[in-house]
Amino acid sequence: MTRSVTRPSYDRKALTPGIVHIGVGNFHRAHQAVYLDDLFALGEGHDWAILGAGVRPTDARMREALAAQDNLSTVIELDPAGHRARQVGAMVGFLPVEADNAALIEAMSDPRIRIVSLTVTEGGYYVDASGAFDPTHPDIVADAAHPARPATAFGAILAALRARRDAGVTPFTVMSCDNLPGNGHVTRNAVVGLAELYDAELAGWVKAQVAFPNGMVDRITPATGPHERELAQGFGLADPVPVTCEPFRQWVIEDHFPAGRPALEKVGVTFTPHVHAYEAMKIRILNGGHAVIAYPSALMDIQLVHAAMAHPLIAAFLHKVEVEEILPHVPPVPDTSIPDYLTLIESRFSNPEIADTTRRLCLDGSNRQPKFIVPSLRDNLAAGTVPKGLVLLSALWCRYCFGTTDSGVVVEPNDPNWTALQDRARRAKETPAEWLAMTEVYGDLAQNDLLAAEFAAALEAVWRDGAEAVLRRFLAA
């Protein structure tokens, strides 16, 4: 190793586990584990180390890789001013990944474990299209039929909670660290929903006794590939699973931990009952901002996000739409300047070291638009204004879903509903109202005549003149 690598300054052998974390991926290792590493470096919380765990084959591969390096994770911050590398030592073990999750259940039953945290991805919570828990999913049905041999994280959590209840041990707190709104509520619905399928008494006990705090997490963390491994080698580290990330990180969470928690407020975590306000700010400004730059960039054949932000038309379009149509409808956030948050987001989007792609930002628009863009559309209309920038964005999304860029490059399928979207975009070219008629995206907004007229004009202009020309005209207005 070289001197430029920061290593744990505390005695890792003195750590004892207080947290089981299910789903040890890149985000967890660049986020929760880093915060705990910082806390341990202060000489505090040494009984809150992490035991890694997982329920999928990919978790077994991660366990093998980390075990070979004493469960240390290399985390490289991609700051344009210079990369920084550290070895994070907050994890002291990684449980065997087993089909019946016996080792995981046993570990979570240990009274020393007071928090079970999860990063199982947004799609790992067994919800249906409406966002409700889906009791008919085959994995859930199987766990309900064989609760002593669960295959899912939620089945294992329930088995451990039942063991703790029967032994008179205080239940652990279940803490989702996934990037989805109301993640505590979603997790509670999954755990209780599964319990109700096979043990109503256990379900009632979980409802009454187990805490599921909501939290907002944020840090851009790319997938690991050859480039990331090369970066680690540049620091003298032969790590097959290094993590790269942006310098920025944020964690906002409800202070609802009946079994206790580490003092993470000492290392920058915000504990507040107002998590929803922070979520709304992030969803409207960051996630909504991603959508604003995604589709015009893609139509203009700009492939990288930082390159899009370096294009004066794209950057100006983002800023104008945010300031005039999104920010005015973001509810106040405690101790936060909304304009300063926008400045931060624009800076993060512009980081050339991250190499995020516009195609990733365009992904899954049929699910993202209703969450990230349509609420701002509605708020503007309710205030008596037609948000021309957001309407133009909707037209650009429609044009993108037609399946070609302005130069004629074919857009590969980029949405779970791509075929249906492409068919509708083709019909909308002649009849723009077809696009707004997607009630699963726009609800009843098609009935707003002013919106419908503005959308029709915008889509016609996009087809006639192309994305670059319509952005230039919009910005000149």
Swiss-Prot record:
Source organism: Cereibacter sphaeroides
PROSITE patterns (UniProt xref): MANNITOL_DHGENASE
Taxonomy, superkingdom: Bacteria
Catalytic reaction list: D-mannitol + NAD(+) = D-fructose + NADH + H(+)
Record-given protein name: Mannitol 2-dehydrogenase
SUPFAM superfamilies xref list: 6-phosphogluconate dehydrogenase C-terminal domain-like (SSF48179), NAD(P)-binding Rossmann-fold domains (SSF51735)
InterPro entries registered for this protein in UniProt: 6-PGluconate_DH-like_C_sf, 6PGD_dom2, Mannitol_DH, Mannitol_DH/Oxidoreductase, Mannitol_DH_C, Mannitol_DH_CS, Mannitol_DH_N, NAD(P)-bd_dom_sf
Oligomer and partners: Monomer.
EC number(s) on file: 1.1.1.67
Gene that encodes the chain: mtlK
Listed GO MF terms: mannitol 2-dehydrogenase activity
The entry's keywords: NAD, Oxidoreductase
First-level EC class: oxidoreductase
Binding-site residues, NAD(+): 19-30
GO biological process, one term: mannitol metabolic process
Stored Pfam families: Mannitol_dh, Mannitol_dh_C
Family as reported in the entry's similarity comment: Belongs to the mannitol dehydrogenase family.
